[in-house]
Curated annotation (Swiss-Prot):
This is Pyruvate dehydrogenase E1 component subunit alpha, somatic form, mitochondrial. The pyruvate dehydrogenase complex catalyzes the overall conversion of pyruvate to acetyl-CoA and CO(2), and thereby links the glycolytic pathway to the tricarboxylic cycle. It comes from Sus scrofa. Thiamine diphosphate binds at Y117, R118, G164, V166, D195, G196, A197, N224, H291. Phosphorylation at Ser-231, Ser-292 and Ser-299 by PDK family kinases inactivates the enzyme; for this phosphorylation at a single site is sufficient. Phosphorylation at Ser-292 interferes with access to active site, and thereby inactivates the enzyme. Dephosphorylation at all three sites, i.e. at Ser-231, Ser-292 and Ser-299, is required for reactivation.
């Protein structure tokens, strides 16, 4: 037994030494490279974002790590869900990593972002750790909402969630943009919704107010082709979501290309900051998972369709190929990042399964900022719930 343990220790020691380190050290990489990106379709705009962009080695490595982290985190959530450690609603965004990472790359940390319930990726790109996100999914005290929000209700600084009601975040986003303007801040709000929510009346009401008041609001339709199990063609009389703001200018963007998303976001944010009012972006993307964990995702589309997107337009693969072919990084170096990311996810999952759940007496915490002054029929219902942080 001891002998075996010793042998396995030696072997694992050998396995852990990154052989590629020597290679990487001796090789020189380009500091940056210029790439052609797909031209955006425009609505009510004379010109759009540039069709070439420069990617630095440093940014490329950062984007790659972030996208890979979101992908692995979602796959880990899938695994924990199947083990019944995560319960209830759970909407995964694998396939859409170029959207959350690309949008973040195009704005400042002081800008604002609000989205619907497919929010894990944005929660991460807005600055929370994988630990806090996975622990929130498993309902533990170390989660970003102390385990009470779950998959659809996570928040970070300048990130207003996760919202469980379809489309309800859009008027809220217009409100955040109103606050930016009212307070005289040079900030914008990215207001996201899906193709399923795009047919909601409240979205058109928000368009109208935002245009009337020239709010710095970037309305972003993440079009992943299916609202639950309904394809866009079956749900919308016009699937040109970028044109549906009518009097609001729009862009249709390749949402599988992080550089396309980044440039379009920079363009849209600059448009809003210049005081011209709102602008619309449609990100054409794709989700590999079903709508939620209860949806296998193959009754309304074929496995072949999913496989084709994976093999031809995967956002992570696209970035990787560009970086390797332009001498911005080596395959070995990117593999090393993959190993580090996997380890980070494993550690986070360990924490998310070992961390304690909040006790029942904390049920009423954080409902009121302090003990509420009112009584109902002569009794204070909340007396037993002390509100403490």
């Amino acid at each position: 037994g001891k002998m075996l343990a010793a042998v396995s220790r030696v072997l694992s020691g050998v396995a852990q030494k990154p052989a590629s380190r020597v290679l990487v050290a001796s090789r020189t990489f380009a500091n940056d490279a210029t790439f052609e990106i797909k031209k955006c379709d425009l609505h009510r705009l004379e010109e759009g974002p540039p069709v070439t962009t420069v990617l630095t080695r440093e940014d490329g490595l950062k984007y790659y790590r972030m996208m890979q982290t979101v992908r692995r985190m979602e796959l880990k959530a899938d695994q924990l869900y199947k083990q019944k450690i995560i319960r209830g609603f759970c909407h995964l965004c694998d396939g859409q990593e170029a959207c959350c990472v690309g949008l973040e790359a195009g704005i400042n940390p002081t800008d604002h972002l609000i989205t619907a319930y497919r929010a894990h990726g944005f929660t991460f790109t807005r600055g929370l750790s994988v630990r806090e996100i996975l622990a929130e999914l498993t309902g533990r005290r170390g989660g970003c909402g102390k385990g009470k929000g779950g998959s659809m209700h996570m928040y970070a600084k300048n990130f207003y969630g996760g919202n469980g009601i379809v489309g309800a975040q859009v008027p809220l986003g217009a409100g955040i943009a109103l606050a930016c303007k009212y307070n005289g801040k040079d900030e914008v709000c990215l207001t996201l919704y899906g193709d399923g929510a795009a047919n909601q009346g409240q979205i058109f009401e928000a368009y109208n107010m935002a245009a009337l008041w020239k709010l710095p609001c970037v309305f972003i339709c993440e079009n992943n082709r299916y609202g639950m199990g309904t394809s866009v063609e079956r749900a919308a009389a016009s699937t040109d979501y970028y044109k549906r703001g009518d009097f609001i200018p729009g862009l249709r963007v390749d949402g599988m290309d992080i550089l396309c998303v980044r440039e379009a976001t920079r363009f849209a944010a600059a448009y809003c900051r210049s005081g011209k009012g709102p602008i619309l972006m449609e990100l054409q993307t794709y989700r590999y998972h079903g709508h939620s964990m209860s949806d296998p995702g193959v009754s309304y589309r074929t496995r072949e369709e999913i496989q084709e997107v994976r093999s031809k337009s995967d956002p992570i693969m696209l970035l990787k190929d560009r970086m390797v072919n332009s001498n911005l990084a080596s395959v070995e170096e990117l593999k090393e990042i993959d190993v580090e990311v996997r380890k980070e996810i494993e550690d986070a999952a360990q924490f998310a399964t070992a961390d304690p759940e909040p006790p029942l007496e904390e049920l009423g915490y954080h409902i009121y900022c302090n003990d509420p002054p009112f009584e109902v029929r002569g009794a204070n219902q909340w007396i037993k719930f002390k509100s403490i942080s």
